[in-house]
């Protein structure tokens, strides 16, 4: 690999990198504190669209992670930015929670089930047959189909949960329409994050625990990529992919001396 510029800004995934099964990853609180005191720009990225940045800040704080709201970038925020760029002041029928609805309201979108420009699907713990049926009919009537992220499952203390990608597949099967996924591994998620902190890809590193989203997304956006072994992907699994991260480390604790 060619020599890269020293890392001046950091993007890091949340689940599996900073927290795991409701607990902080060892070294993660120190890692966040080191990034904050260094003055280097950083963002915590998540494909989870359920929570607002304020909600996530509070949840992370309870685990000893001091992450300010402005340092969180979610697929919900990226979706809001994408829609505002595509069709300013548009309308959307939304299946999702406060993180997504707040992000769309913040960019001036009107949420409606009457002839919306878009059907926007995000994460929720209360998917209803009625809401999914309405989404199918609106898409059949011409609404464009957007989904915050392609993850088919998500983590919980009890085990895997169906995620937005699974519900999107069901809606696609019923309509014959594939959604446009905004979140990771779409490199647009990375580019929007970089723009948010005025960072450049050549001097930014992406830390993640998943080869199929975090590392792929970082590679396609031109970032240095760092795989940690505290989440989904193992060293053995990483070897099976046709692409490789810039490096593999045990956890973010191994990066403390670099910040």
What are the functions of these language-model segments?
Residues 2-40, 49-73, 77-259:
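Asp-based, Mg2+/Mn2+-dependent phosphohydrolase catalytic module
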């Amino acid at each position: 690999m060619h020599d890269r510029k020293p890392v001046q800004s950091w993007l890091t995934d949340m689940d599996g990198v900073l927290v795991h099964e409701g607990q902080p990853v060892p070294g993660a609180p120190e890692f966040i504190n080191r990034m904050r005191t260094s003055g280097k720009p950083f963002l915590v990225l998540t494909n989870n669209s359920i929570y607002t940045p304020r909600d996530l800040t509070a949840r992370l704080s309870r685990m000893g992670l001091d992450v300010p709201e402005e340092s969180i970038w979610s697929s919900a925020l990226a979706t809001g930015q994408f829609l505002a760029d595509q069709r300013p002041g548009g309308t959307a029928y939304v299946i999702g929670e406060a993180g997504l609805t707040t992000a769309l309201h913040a960019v001036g979108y009107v949420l409606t089930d009457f002839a919306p420009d878009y059907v926007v699907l995000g994460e929720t713990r209360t998917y209803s047959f009625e809401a999914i049926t309405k989404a199918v009919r609106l898409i059949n009537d011409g609404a464009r189909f957007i989904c915050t992220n392609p993850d088919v499952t998500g983590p919980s203390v009890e085990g895997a949960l169906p995620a937005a990608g699974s519900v999107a597949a069901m809606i696609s099967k019923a309509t014959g329409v594939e959604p446009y996924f905004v979140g990771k591994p779409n490199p647009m998620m990375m580019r929007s994050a970089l723009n948010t902190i005025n960072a450049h890809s050549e001097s930014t590193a992406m830390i993640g625990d998943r080869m199929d989203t975090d590392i792929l997304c970082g590679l396609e956006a031109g970032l240095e990529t760092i795989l940690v072994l505290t989440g989904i992907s193992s060293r053995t699994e990483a070897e099976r992919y046709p692409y490789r991260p810039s490096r593999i480390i045990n956890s973010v604790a191994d990066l403390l001396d670099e910040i």
